[in-house]
């Protein structure tokens, strides 16, 4: 398949020019170089020459150039009065986008296309409803594509669905579609697009598309690829389930039952079921997994507000706010806020004891970017007492370092991050806890309604990338701990005088008791959970706040590593997190400790000493900027 294996030990990279893909020279890279503080600000301010320089971006935040190309072609063909469009892999997802827009009083229509290679199905117009199932629709080189068209001034509304739900067309699927159109355009006869019609959509006659796009495909959607993808997806599900079992503790599982017994632990561990591959569901992005978890809760449980506990990645909160009846937001994720939550639960239950006071509680372990770990023991107790779902996003902690499934009804992970590591493919997973009291209902619904929209070629790359996941975690854990142990004594929080660093946000220092309670015991189930005893580590992510904006900018600019959005890469990647995620709400974020000057660093597998040297140099630049 033309894939190359990534080394677990890599060289520390210098920053690369603005707008180039990160990692460079990588098809379907999912980050972009933002090498300086000022260029990042200019990008967020919409300065034209800066935005024009961007050749890439994080796929949910930045519509990739090949996706823009295909969208433009389809807008020219099917758009009326300058309509814009969004592209989706299935009718079901397109309809969800349409409903999201209609709920905001925006009209949207769907055109379905069957894109066929020359000579397939004679390129005739095919009028039909959604295929019976996705496997039938992708059983050949032909590709179904669903186009949501809407008024041009409503693009920002459609883009919210694209960003929050993460269900837009994959860049690899886009390349496949463009390659078919390119090949077909070279032939004198035949149409490369066949519209499918749906209720409420007018028929659109096919026209020849002229396409001048030269695509270098990594693979083709066809027989062998689909067979490989089916195997890859099965291996991914088995790998995730296997990691949860491998790094789980039999003794530990006996202490929790997710609603089947009390927390004192009086039930034998043999009454507990291990998670299997059939409890693991794959999605095209981590946010798609989160979005679907929320939709699953809305479908299975009585309607109520959700709870967002702890300051989360920005789109998680948006999903809980924009779908369903809204959410209660507890940004600190502290024990005192659990007390506040309990008061709300008591009040709501007193008001109506016939249904749970909340739908579900979503939390990250630990949180991004403040690395705060909530007290899962208390949250699980409340979930049992008041009968609501507990969904835990363990992306930052990861399968190797923390064991949080025993507390969760639903476990969520962005596989795009450290599970992949190569930053060249997106993916997400949702795992149902087989020991949960609501497992049967959740399982029945997802089994009936789950649609596999994970593009085959993406699954193949994800499987390949994740083969050395465990080995990479150990290297990254050690590197990050060495860096944070170096930086912490230079912080105000640690009592340093004339410091430029205010705080080092890292699980070892932020709510360590909650994090360490969930450390994996290691594969030998050593009862002492600590990195030194072969157990889980503190992960590869940390954030820094500074005593001045000038110090923040100087530190960031001086870092000799890749700089741009995303995390969990095999290489060290820094970003101005708050500017990227909350630029239009800086004051709002600051009140919860997410300061505008925060720098987030995802540590890679480079040489430890080389990493320490660049961190020390950046610290020196920050001190100089403050006149120290």
Curated annotation (Swiss-Prot):
Gene3D superfamilies: Aspartate Aminotransferase, domain 1, Type I PLP-dependent aspartate aminotransferase-like (Major domain). Its cofactor is pyridoxal 5'-phosphate. The modification N6-(pyridoxal phosphate)lysine is found at residue 417. Coiled coil: none annotated. One of its GO terms (molecular function) is pyridoxal phosphate binding. It comes from the Eukaryota. Keywords: Lyase, Pyridoxal phosphate. Disulfide bonds: none annotated. InterPro entries: Cys/Met-Metab_PyrdxlP-dep_enz, PyrdxlP-dep_Trfase, PyrdxlP-dep_Trfase_major, PyrdxlP-dep_Trfase_small, Trans-sulfuration_enzymes. Substrate binds at residue 313. One of its GO terms (biological process) is transsulfuration. Its EC number is 4.4.-.-. Pathway: Secondary metabolite biosynthesis. Induction: Expression is highly induced during artificial growth in symbiosis with Populus, which is close to its natural condition. Pfam families: Cys_Met_Meta_PP. Cystathionine gamma-synthase-like enzyme; part of the gene cluster that mediates the biosynthesis of the psychoactive metabolites ibotenic acid and muscimol. The first committed step is glutamate hydroxylation by the 2-oxoglutarate-dependent dioxygenase iboH, and the last step is decarboxylation of ibotenic acid to muscimol by the decarboxylase iboD. The order of the intermediate reactions is somewhat ambiguous. IboA likely activates the carboxylic acid at position 5 to introduce an amide bond, and the flavin monooxygenase iboF generates the N-O bond. Belongs to the trans-sulfuration enzymes family. This is Cystathionine gamma-synthase-like enzyme iboG2. It comes from Amanita muscaria (strain Koide BX008). The gene is iboG2.
């Amino acid at each position: 398949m033309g894939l190359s294996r990534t080394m677990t030990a890599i060289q520390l990279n210098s920053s690369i020019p603005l707008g180039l893909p990160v990692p460079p020279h990588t098809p379907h890279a999912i980050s972009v170089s933002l090498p300086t503080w000022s260029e990042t600000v200019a990008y967020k301010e919409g300065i034209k020459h800066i935005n024009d320089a961007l050749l890439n971006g994080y796929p949910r935040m930045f519509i990739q150039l090949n996706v823009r190309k295909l969208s433009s072609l389809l807008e020219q063909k099917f758009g009326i009065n300058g309509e814009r469009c969004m592209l989706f892999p299935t009718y079901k997802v397109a309809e969800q986008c349409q409903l999201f827009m209609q709920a905001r009083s925006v009209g949207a229509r769907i055109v379905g296309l069957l894109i066929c290679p020359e000579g397939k199905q004679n390129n005739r117009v095919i009028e039909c409803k959604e295929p019976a199932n996705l496997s039938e629709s992708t059983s050949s080189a032909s590709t179904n594509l669903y186009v949501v068209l809407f008024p041009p001034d409503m693009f920002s509304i459609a883009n919210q669905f694209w960003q929050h739900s993460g269900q837009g067309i994959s860049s690899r699927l886009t390349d496949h579609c463009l390659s078919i159109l390119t090949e077909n355009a070279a032939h004198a006869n035949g149409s490369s697009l066949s519209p499918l019609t749906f209720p409420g959509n007018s028929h659109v006659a096919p026209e020849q598309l002229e396409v001048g796009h030269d695509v270098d495909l990594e693979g083709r959607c066809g027989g062998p690829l689909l067979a490989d993808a089916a195997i890859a997806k099965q291996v991914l599900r088995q790998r995730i389930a296997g990691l949860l079992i491998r790094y789980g503790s039999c003794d530990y599982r006996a202490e929790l039952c997710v609603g089947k017994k009390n927390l004192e632990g009086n039930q034998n561990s043999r009454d507990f079921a291990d998670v299997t591959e059939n409890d693991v569901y794959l999605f095209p992005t981590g946010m798609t997994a989160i979005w679907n978890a929320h939709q699953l809760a809305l479908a299975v449980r009585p309607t109520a507000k959700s709870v967002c506990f702890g300051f989360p990645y920005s789109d998680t909160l948006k999903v809980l706010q924009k779908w369903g009846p809204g959410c209660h937001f507890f940004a600190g994720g502290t024990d005192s806020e659990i007390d506040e939550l309990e008061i709300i639960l008591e009040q709501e239950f007193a008001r109506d004891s016939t249904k749970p006071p909340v739908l579900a509680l979503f939390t990250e372990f630990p949180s991004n970017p403040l690395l705060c770990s909530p007290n899962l023991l208390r949250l699980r107790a409340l979930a049992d007492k008041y009968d609501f779902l507990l969904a835990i996003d363990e992306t930052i902690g990861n399968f190797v370092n923390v064991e949080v499934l025993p507390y969760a009804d639903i476990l969520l992970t962005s596989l795009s991050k450290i599970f992949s590591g190569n930053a060249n493919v997106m993916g997400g997973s949702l795992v149902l806890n087989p020991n949960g009291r609501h497992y049967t209902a959740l399982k029945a619904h997802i089994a009936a309604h789950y649609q596999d929209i994970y593009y085959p070629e993406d699954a193949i790359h994800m499987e390949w990338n994740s083969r050395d996941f465990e080995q990479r975690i150990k290297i990254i854990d050690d590197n990050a701990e060495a860096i944070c142990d170096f930086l912490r004594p230079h912080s105000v929080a640690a009592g340093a005088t004339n410091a430029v660093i205010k705080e080092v946000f890292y699980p070892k220092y932020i709510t360590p008791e909650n994090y360490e309670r969930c450390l994996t015991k290691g594969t030998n189930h050593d009862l002492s959970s600590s990195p030194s005893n072969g157990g889980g580590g503190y992960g590869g992510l940390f954030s820094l706040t500074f005593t001045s904006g000038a110090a923040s900018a100087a530190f960031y600019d001086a870092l000799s590593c890749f700089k741009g959005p995303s995390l969990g890469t095999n290489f060290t990647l820094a970003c101005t997190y708050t500017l990227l995620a909350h630029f239009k709400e800086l004051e709002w974020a600051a009140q919860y400790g997410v300061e505008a000057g925060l720098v987030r660093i995802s540590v890679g597998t480079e040489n430890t000493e080389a990493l320490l040297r660049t961190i020390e140099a950046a610290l020196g630049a920050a001190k100089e900027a403050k006149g120290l």
